[in-house]
Each structure stands twice: as structure tokens, then as C-alpha cells.
């Protein structure tokens, strides 16, 4: 058992907190998985019939290994965000949420819209490098760009050799970890605002 300075079991520091995950990219999903590691209840909102796009990330050979890693400590809610009956469900869920982990997918915005003015969740909104300016950097949302721009690719490969793309989305993992750190500070301070 790992304890922080207060004597609280670190694995349960987020016990009683609700995290809603609405994402198609690894960064926000990894942040939500870390929140689950610390005891938060994490609910992944997935569109039927195939679920989150993260279930199919990468080549078919890695699907079976990838999803259990990113979906650990989470529960899944199959919900069609465009269905009229989804709004009351999202409103109830959003009213209880402490944190919404989302990316540029439209469904994440619908969860926050459902919360309306009564929403009190910290909004952890992550998006790929360059997604805010696709007119300038149409290719910059690719994970290879993020790994190169962040310096992650320079840390891999042979000395004096070319850079090597890591097997895992290392830049996404770092972004998710940093975003969750900011969100935890916001939760600790009791502030509810856009934090990443």
C-alpha cells in the first residue's frame, strides 16, 4: 500500500469521484485510465454498435492487447449521442461527474452541453497537436508528428541512428498524464473550469 503524506491509500485517493470519458484518441483515455488507477469510477461513453474507436486502434493483431490496457478500471456505457433519448441519460451522468475527459470528437461536447449550467465537472479537453489549425498543419495530428515534435522519437532507436517511432503512443501518454495532473489540481482546489 502506497500512502501519501496524509496517510491516505494512494490507490484510493480518487475514490468517490466520477470520471466520464468521451474520446477517440489515446491521450484522454490514458488520463481516464490513470484516474481509475487512483480509485475513480470511470465510465466510457461508447457509440453502438462497435464502441470506441480505440477498440480498433492500430493493426488487428494488437487490438486484443491494446483495449484491455487503455480500458482498465473502466465501465462502458453504450449510448448513441444523437438519439433523442440519450439527452436525459447524459444529463444525469454529467450532473454527477467530477471530471469529463474528452477530445475533439463531437460526443464529448454533447456531454458538456447536457450538463448545461448545472455542470460542475472539470473539463479536461485534449486534442492532437495542430488540430486547432488544420489549415496550416493538415498532417500534424498524426502521432508521429507529436512524437517527433515532443522529442520522444529522439529518445528511441540506436545511438547515432535514425529516430524510431515508439511501439506505444508515448506522446499521448505524456499528454494524458500532464492533463490529469492539472485536472487533479483543479479538483483539489475546488475549481471547475477548462483545465487542459
Residues of each region from the PLM?
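N-terminal helix-loop segment corresponding to the beta1-alpha1 unit
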Residues: 1-194
Amino acid at each position: 500500500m502506497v500512502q501519501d503524506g496524509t496517510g491516505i491509500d494512494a490507490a484510493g485517493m480518487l475514490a468517490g469521484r466520477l470520471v466520464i470519458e468521451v474520446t477517440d484518441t489515446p491521450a484522454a483515455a490514458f488520463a481516464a485510465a490513470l484516474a481509475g488507477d487512483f480509485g475513480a469510477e470511470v465510465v466510457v461513453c461508447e457509440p453502438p454498435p462497435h464502441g470506441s474507436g480505440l477498440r480498433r486502434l492500430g493493426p488487428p493483431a494488437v487490438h486484443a492487447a491494446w483495449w484491455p490496457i487503455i480500458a482498465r478500471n473502466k465501465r462502458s456505457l453504450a449510448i448513441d449521442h444523437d438519439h433523442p433519448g440519450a439527452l436525459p441519460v447524459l444529463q444525469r451522468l454529467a450532473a454527477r461527474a467530477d471530471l469529463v475527459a474528452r477530445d475533439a470528437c463531437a460526443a464529448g461536447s454533447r456531454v458538456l452541453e447536457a450538463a448545461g449550467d448545472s455542470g460542475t465537472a472539470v473539463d479536461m479537453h485534449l486534442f492532437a497537436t495542430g488540430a486547432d489549425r488544420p489549415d496550416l498543419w493538415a498532417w500534424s495530428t498524426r502521432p508521429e508528428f507529436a512524437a517527433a515534435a515532443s522529442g520522444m522519437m529522439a529518445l528511441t532507436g540506436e545511438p547515432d541512428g535514425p529516430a524510431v517511432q515508439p511501439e506505444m503512443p508515448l506522446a499521448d501518454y505524456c499528454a494524458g498524464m500532464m492533463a490529469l495532473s492539472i485536472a487533479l489540481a483543479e479538483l483539489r482546489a475546488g475549481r471547475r473550469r477548462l483545465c487542459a
